[in-house]
Amino acid sequence: MHFPLIPMVKLEEIKQIFKPKLLPIIWNKTKLTLLDQSRLPFEKIYVDVTKVEEVSDAIRTMKVRGAPAIGITAGYGMVLAIQDSISLEKAISDLTKAKKILDESRPTAVNLMWATSRMLNKAKDLVEQGNAKSVKELKELLEIEANKIFEEEYEAELKIGLYGIEKVNDGDTILTQCNAGGLATGTGLGTALAPAKLANALGIKVSVIAPETRPWLQGSRLTVYELMEENIPVTLIADTAVGLVMFKKMVNSVMVGADRILSDGHVFNKIGTFKEAVIAHELGIPFYALAPSSTFDMISTVDQVKIEERSPDEVRSIKGVYISPKEVKVYNPVFDVTPPKYVSAIITEYGIIYPPFDKNMRRMLGK
């Protein structure tokens, strides 16, 4: 287990050196400006939202995607909820209604409910303790809280990126999967893409190979676009080319994000991750999962985690055009699970965790 402390000066330094070129979420006091990810990569369009209903719609229609990005967006949505509140009592009522509206926009998004609960509880505490004596004061203090949600996420990603750089050498090529970048987290940095972005900002030349990631094509639509915006060399490959690029030694390491990591080190991530891990293990290529500690599930066993399945038409068609018989049976799991034997290390904001994961993860979390 490797837990070097990140000197604060180094963290502050990297904040000055790296400035994201792609900002998916922009807050401007009375409005929230969102990059419409459903239109990428062919159209870069920002939309302004000023009402809770508009924020909910942006989440529901995938203008905003990725659990951390949804949480950040919801936090600012709660601030917008009291723009027109006429009293503190009405503000709490408006926030309660806003939480319900936002939570229903993506019922399975844990970060969404976490953010709206945090904002509502903060508002109640401020009013009950007399720290907000007017709606104006309450709005200002809630805006500070929403900014904290953003800043905490960004700082965690910076730390993940700095720890990840320890696994990168000048001239390396990293293989990734799906989109675990700043578009998914809302900060412009990301988790699995953070080491490549920070390395290049520090003058360490790193390139990335991105599989297309069927059926939603997050690799070709989002990861490639995001890295090109940051001027980081990236090569797009078909999902079926993953084995060959590793066999030909075109890859020095594999870095992926994670939707859930169990206490024993099982990693749940976008479908296709397991394949990369097995091939990397066979060929002696290190495989790293990069994720914040909020991703850890210290309770569930691998058999208890349900893997989501999506519409068969996502596989049968591309953008409404069928590429197979409409009647064919389809199995379309969104995620797969990588056993811990294939995971070289898990990189978090607290440090790098090596096997045995069940022991070292609990040590890190103090459990």
Curated annotation (Swiss-Prot):
GO terms for molecular function: S-methyl-5-thioribose-1-phosphate isomerase activity. It comes from the Archaea. It holds the Pfam family IF-2B. Its EC number is 5.3.1.23. It catalyses: 5-(methylsulfanyl)-alpha-D-ribose 1-phosphate = 5-(methylsulfanyl)-D-ribulose 1-phosphate. The keyword DNA-binding does not apply. InterPro entries: IF-2B-related, IF-M1Pi, IF_2B-like_C, Initiation_fac_2B_a/b/d, M1Pi_N, NagB/RpiA_transferase-like. Keywords: Amino-acid biosynthesis, Isomerase, Methionine biosynthesis. The keyword Lyase does not apply. The record marks 178 as: Transition state stabilizer. PANTHER family: METHYLTHIORIBOSE-1-PHOSPHATE ISOMERASE. Belongs to the eIF-2B alpha/beta/delta subunits family. MtnA subfamily. NCBIfam families: eIF-2B_rel, PRK05720.1, PRK05772.1, salvage_mtnA. This is Putative methylthioribose-1-phosphate isomerase. It comes from Sulfolobus acidocaldarius (strain ATCC 33909 / DSM 639 / JCM 8929 / NBRC 15157 / NCIMB 11770).
